[in-house]
């Protein structure tokens, strides 16, 4: 006779790794073309001037400049402001 009862198998115990989403370049930060500004699911933050939108809704810089977050008509919008050449 067994002195211990057989342990039942659990059907839980799995989890997926976090997707590393969020703002990657903050307001006022210097960016170059191609820099990722925001990684997101859906357009939580909308693209504005001088930024592109990837097929996975990633917002990235199209020009060299400074990141600017603004609110327009209840939408968060991100722009890249061109730096005036000296």
UniProtKB/Swiss-Prot annotation:
Keywords: Ribonucleoprotein, Ribosomal protein. InterPro entries: Ribosomal_bL27, Ribosomal_bL27_CS. It comes from the Bacteria. One of its GO terms (cellular component) is ribonucleoprotein complex. Pfam families: Ribosomal_L27. The keyword Ribonucleoprotein applies. Coiled coil: none annotated. One of its GO terms (biological process) is translation. GO terms for molecular function: structural constituent of ribosome. Residues 1-26 are annotated as: Disordered. HAMAP family: Ribosomal_bL27 (MF_00539). Belongs to the bacterial ribosomal protein bL27 family. This is Large ribosomal subunit protein bL27.
């Amino acid at each position: 006779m067994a002195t211990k009862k057989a342990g039942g198998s659990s059907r839980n115990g799995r989890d997926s790794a976090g997707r590393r989403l969020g703002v990657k370049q903050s307001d006022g930060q210097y960016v170059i073309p191609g820099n990722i500004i925001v990684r997101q699911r859906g357009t939580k933050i909308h693209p504005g001037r001088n930024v592109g939108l990837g097929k996975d809704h990633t917002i990235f810089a199209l020009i060299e400049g400074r990141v600017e977050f603004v609110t327009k008509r209840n939408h968060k919008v991100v722009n890249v402001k061109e730096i005036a050449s000296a």
